[in-house]
């Protein structure tokens, strides 16, 4: 049996780039909560003792940007300079303007267009992916890397591992078998965790705690064997972290946000963008399409691409690839996709209820992945029933 190795990585909520994603989405939530028609393009950057939010926002909402920044940093655990940032004493810079009137008239006609007439907020192409290798219909390498990161945060916040600090990264290598185009995971080959820690803990304690409290609860036993390799804080020291260790920027973790390197990516980031931005809404609807294809048994693995032109509602192209796992030809799957999914941005917004902010809805997406999550707010994870005829044997 010929196998291959494939690797996906993830980062924690305290990673500087992810901190920026979460601040940008917390701003989006606050705008949409008061004004569902808010137009938001919010970027964040951070470095030692400083956070800056900048971009274009047109909204009727009354938003205290500085308060949102400080609350988001505090909730993650950035409460003193030792851990990488002090939420209550860092500098917060705000440089936000209105959306360009040129873009506004072309996309939503200054809010006069009907939903089906709303044009794409920009050009671009987005991909959705699904695979039957996990219950979430997501790649196992990505699922495990993501869950290890989420578990690190959990044991830090619940006090199980009090030596943990907010920043950290995970990476998982899985050995796979290619079953006629479908991916079958056989075992976990390598687990890598690099986590920020305090001054007091030894490397041996770090390794023991990570194995017992992070790896064991997350990675199913059937995937681990005596040959599995563990790299636990391989650099030997990671006390300085967060924005003190590295600068951070919104939109720098787009593969972690999606499929861990599987499928494909059009390059557009998600966080801080309202649903007229097809980078986000387009990627969400094609995930729903790909997931529905696999869940309905049309294929074991599937990639869907959609593309747009600024100001034009209808997509320029839709593409489906079942990697040879389709029960019917890809062109027939494509026909089913076009009949069941409306790719116009205004209609995506309605069908996936994307104008609803508040309740940390988009903030939740900004750490530990936008896809494969069981949460009613992740409306794009709902499987649509698709009618199709099984070919006669």
Swiss-Prot record:
Its cofactor is Mn(2+); Mg(2+); Co(2+); K(+). Binds 2 divalent ions per subunit. The metal ions interact primarily with the substrate. Can utilize magnesium, manganese or cobalt (in vitro). Binds 1 potassium ion per subunit. The potassium ion interacts primarily with the substrate. The keyword Magnesium applies. The keyword DNA-binding does not apply. The lineage of its organism: Eukaryota, Viridiplantae, Streptophyta, Embryophyta, Tracheophyta. Optimum temperature is 50 degrees Celsius. Thermoalkaliphic enzyme which tolerates conditions from 40 up to 55 degrees Celsius. It is found in: Cytoplasm. It comes from the Eukaryota. InterPro entries: ADOMET_SYNTHASE_CS, S-AdoMet_synt_C, S-AdoMet_synt_central, S-AdoMet_synt_N, S-AdoMet_synthetase, S-AdoMet_synthetase_sfam. Belongs to the AdoMet synthase family. It catalyses: L-methionine + ATP + H2O = S-adenosyl-L-methionine + phosphate + diphosphate. GO terms for biological process: one-carbon metabolic process; S-adenosylmethionine biosynthetic process. ATP binds at residues 15, 167-169, 235-238, 246, 252-253, 269, 273, 277. Optimum pH is 8.5-10.5. Thermoalkaliphic enzyme which tolerates conditions from 6 up to pH 10.5. L-methionine binds at residues 56, 99, 246, 277. Catalyzes the formation of S-adenosylmethionine from methionine and ATP. Pfam families: S-AdoMet_synt_C, S-AdoMet_synt_M, S-AdoMet_synt_N. This is S-adenosylmethionine synthase. GO terms for cellular component: cytoplasm.
